[in-house]
Regions:
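A conserved beta-strand element that flanks and buttresses the S-adenosyl-L-methionine
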Residues: 190
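Conserved SAM-binding loop of SAM-dependent methyltransferases across substrates and taxa
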Residues: 124-137
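Conserved SAM-binding loop
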Residues: 153-154
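Conserved SAM/SAH-binding beta-strand->alpha-helix loop
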Residues: 146-148
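Conserved beta-strand signature within the Rossmann-like core of class I S-adenosyl-L-methionine
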Residues: 216-225
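Short alpha-helix
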Residues: 247-264
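A short, conserved alpha-helix within the catalytic core of class I
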Residues: 197-210
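Class I SAM-dependent methyltransferase Rossmann-like catalytic core
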Residues: 41-110
Length: 286
């Protein structure tokens, strides 16, 4: 099965949004890789989960985090091993650790011994639950627009015995009215995996201002995808949880820091995975 690693052509974000000419060599190559990926889903557990739930979904990320090749037959497990060995999947696993470290530092640096951590695009919220388990005084508010992700987060909280410390609500991170309704205001805001799926720079820039003018958290923990040699393969072959192409926006971390500075935040730490695909940052209010 083709691995579809680095693309010889570094496609821009605008190019990734457009379909390729139907008979161009690149279109034919990615079409063949997409067909191979769908066929591989009959054998590889990771590809099956990705095609069934989306390659940006909680179930797929859980499979990546587990990092245990699974499949029907030895060939299926080998296909799965290659999937899990992608640079992007390596980066996913590394940023989970980096995000946990940044959130743990944020909880420890909070001005209160019982910090409230708000994840505004929580999904199943694996990072937050790991921090709550290690920091008995911390509490969490988990918000998302996806009811299925919130149901998964509730179930996870119950399994871990953390339901009394976790509040789950359906809301958009970019809804200023929803931010104004958050009470009490969180001490730490986590925005992990949020910026890459929203393509409008002005939306994110305004979001930092909205955060500062509404809940004004002491700290913000974020991640941003800055470069990825597999970005075109992901956009042409993978599908997201809505069945649409996985077109992710790459941004320099400097852009995030500039918008944060304008809203009154400065970096306390910036970490990178070993491939330099992601940056994980912790911001503090100035």
């Amino acid at each position: 099965m083709p691995t579809g690693t680095e693309s010889a052509h570094a496609a821009s974000f605008d190019e990734l949004q457009r379909d390729l000419p139907a008979l161009s060599p690149r279109a034919l190559r990615f079409r063949a890789q997409a067909a191979a990926s769908r066929a591989g889903a009959l054998l590889s557990e990771g590809l099956r989960v990705g095609h069934e739930h989306g390659f940006d979904s909680g179930p797929f990320m859980d499979h990546v985090y587990a990092n245990e090749p699974q499949g029907r037959t030895a060939l299926g497990r080998e296909i799965d091993r290659r999937l899990l060995g992608r640079r992007t999947c390596h980066a996913f696993r590394e940023i989970r650790v980096l995000a946990r470290e940044a959130l743990t530092e944020a909880a420890a640096a909070s001005s209160t011994p019982e910090p409230l951590i708000a994840d505004l695009a929580a999904g199943p919220a694996p990072y937050v639950f790991e921090v709550l388990s290690a920091h008995p005084g911390a509490r969490a508010l988990l918000a998302d627009i996806d009811p299925a992700a919130l149901a998964q987060a509730r179930a996870h909280a119950e399994r871990l015995g953390l339901s009394d410390r976790v509040t789950v609500t359906r809301a958009s991170a970019f809804d200023r009215d929803a931010l104004e309704r958050i009470d009490p205001a969180p001490d730490v805001v986590a925005e992990l995996g949020l910026y890459g799926i929203y393509h409008d720079d002005a939306l994110i820039e305004r979001h930092f201002v909205d955060l500062a003018e509404t809940i004004a958290p002491e700290q913000i923990v974020f991640n941003v995808q800055t470069q990825n040699p597999e970005i075109e393969h992901i956009a042409r072959v993978w599908r997201d949880h809505r069945g649409e192409r996985c077109v992710w926006r790459l941004r320099p971390v400097e852009s995030i820091l500039e918008w944060a500075a304008a809203a009154g935040y400065e970096p306390a730490s910036i970490r990178a995975d070993s491939y330099g695909i992601y940056r994980v940052g912790r911001l503090v209010r100035t």
